[in-house]
Amino acid sequence: KIGKWWLLDAWKENPQAHAGVQLAAVPGARSFVTIPGDKIIHPAVIFAVVHGHGGEDGVIQGLADTMHIPIVGSDTIASAVCWDKVITKQMLESYGIKTAPYKVHHLGEPVPNYEELLSQLGSPLFVKPARSGSSIGVSKVESAEELNAAVTLAHEHSNAILIEQALLGRELEVSVLGNPPHHKVSKVGQIIPGEEFY
């Protein structure tokens, strides 16, 4: 969030005193140089366990590609596409995969008429930023007043937002490690939210 990284060895020595460092990439050498300081880091692999903007959206993955350093997890294109819910939905639809009916709203456009949305999408609705994760900026909407507040909140996180039909049912997740034909698929997990939605 602040453009600094915590080096594990220094952090373990004194977590409170370690303020983080900036890293300068040296692509030809597959390394990073710390700023301040002159420590050179040669990572063998990158574990991208950073959430949110810059972590899940293809930025770190693209840096790893540029540096020719292997990275664990989704590659640059998969990360970027899946981070943008509008692009994800358009791609799924192009392959005939059903998604919840939705409308896209862009910053600066008038808030859609609630009654018209109900006739097109039903109730309740979910309003969510197109580019965000972890349910940040997501609202469940059941009135015109809630719609206005939800659109404002979602636009704090993304210029494009989705207004989507709420689907009732179980939410399942599956992890895939590797690429065909050598990929491995996890067991199916069910998400049981602790709140009204996950």
Feature map (PLM): residue ranges:
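Phosphate-binding site of ATP-dependent enzymes
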Residues: E142-Y198
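ATP-grasp fold ATP-binding core
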Residues: L92-E93, L118-I136, N159-L168, L172
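ATP-binding N-terminal substructure of ATP-dependent carboxylate-amine bond-forming enzymes
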Residues: K1-I77, V81-W83, I87, S94, ...
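Short gly/pro/ser/thr-enriched loop/turn and capping motifs at secondary-structure boundaries
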Residues: I77-C82, G133, G194-E195
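Glycine-rich phosphate/pyrophosphate-binding beta-alpha loops
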Residues: G52, S135, I191-G194
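Glycine-rich phosphate-binding loop of ATP-grasp-fold ATP-dependent ligases
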Residues: A100-V104, L125-T152, E171-E173
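Residue-level detector of anion-binding/catalytic polar loops
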Residues: P70, K98, A160
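Basic phosphate/pyrophosphate-binding loop/patch that engages nucleotide-derived ligands
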Residues: M91-T99, L153
